[in-house]
Design a protein with these regions (language model features):
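Membrane-interface alpha-helices at helix entry/exit sites of multi-pass transporters
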Residues: 38-44, 67-68, 170-183
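Hydrophobic residues within alpha-helical transmembrane segments
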Residues: 8, 12, 47-54, 70, ...
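Selected transmembrane alpha-helices and immediately adjacent juxtamembrane segments
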Residues: 1-35, 125-180
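Hydrophobic/aromatic positions within or immediately flanking transmembrane alpha-helices
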Residues: 42-43, 70, 112-115, 177, ...
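Transmembrane helix exit motif
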Residues: 53-59, 83-96, 112-137, 226-227, ...
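Structural signature of hydrophobic alpha-helical transmembrane segments
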Residues: 2-3, 32-50, 106-117, 146-156, ...
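Selective hydrophobic functional segments
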Residues: 43-102, 189-234
Length: 257
């Protein structure tokens, strides 16, 4: 049961991306936070995110605009390392406050507040149509690459920023999708080894079974959805998911998670 519930949660969160209108990382991070410590949750989300995009790149890779994709990735990669470093940094800060609730001690920490606020912000960006459709001029592409890489390394939230800065770059629909997938893989391939090295040094990697199987189930959810389901958005599901994301983020910020 200890393993079945995390696997079901991971599979369901990944599968819901095809009905809720939210991105894979936006849903998986809070789902994994319910299962494992924060840093491991960020790592597991990154692994599933990259596996899913490696599957996509096989299908759309021929459409990559290498000029824009490489320019974006070159800036995003060091920014992702910086984001990962900042995650390490705030993780080591002392807790802000500790309190007892239901006979359990809960801590409000900087890393919980930061990730909780980022979860709230990016969930709102993907939920509110006017926010989701924000676009930036091509001249700001380097800034977009830096921001996308940094927040990708810090919390995994990279897709919304990447799209907002790429959408006016003159790319065809196919090139936009393919280039975005390539950039996402570049960021994930950078931050995942960094996370592994950092967490192993801090002895913060949990039991292999406790995160390997949920990670596999999350990938299976994304793979099955990609393979067999036309992506549709159901408004009621989107609203319910937004409420759940807000609840999890609030619990994280207040130290209850």
């Amino acid at each position: 049961m200890e393993l079945i519930i995390p696997c079901l949660v991971a599979f369901a969160a990944s599968f819901l991306t095809f009905f809720s209108g939210f991105g894979l990382g936006t849903l998986l991070l809070p789902a994994f936070i319910l299962i494992v410590p924060i840093q491991e949750a960020v790592l597991l989300t990154a692994i599933v995110h990259m596996l899913n995009n490696l599957f996509k790149i096989v299908l759309v890779g021929k459409h990559i605009d290498w000029n824009i994709a490489v320019k974006f990735a070159i800036i995003a990669i060091p920014a992702a390392i910086l984001g990962g470093y900042c995650l390490d940094l705030v993780q080591d800060f002392d807790s802000i406050h500790a309190y007892t609730f239901s006979n359990e001690v809960h801590e409000i920490t900087y890393v919980k507040i930061i990730l909780g606020l980022l979860m709230l912000f990016f969930a709102s960006v993907e939920f509110i149509p006017t926010w989701k459709n924000i676009q930036f001029p091509p001249k700001l592409l380097p800034i977009g690459a830096m921001l996308s890489g940094f927040f990708g390394g810090l919390s995994g939230h990279q897709g919304a920023l990447r799209s907002a800065f790429l959408v006016r770059s003159g790319l065809s629909k196919e090139a936009f999708i393919a280039s975005g997938v390539f950039i996402a893989i570049a960021i994930d391939a950078t931050r995942i080894p960094y996370y592994f090295c950092s967490f192993q040094q801090q002895n913060e990697m949990g039991s292999m079974n406790l995160w390997a199987f949920p990670t596999l189930c999350a990938f299976l959810g994304a793979f099955i959805g990609n393979k067999f389901i036309n992506k549709v958005q159901i408004t009621s599901v989107k609203i319910i998911v937004e409420i759940l994301l807000t609840l999890i983020a609030t619990l994280l910020i207040t130290g209850l998670l």
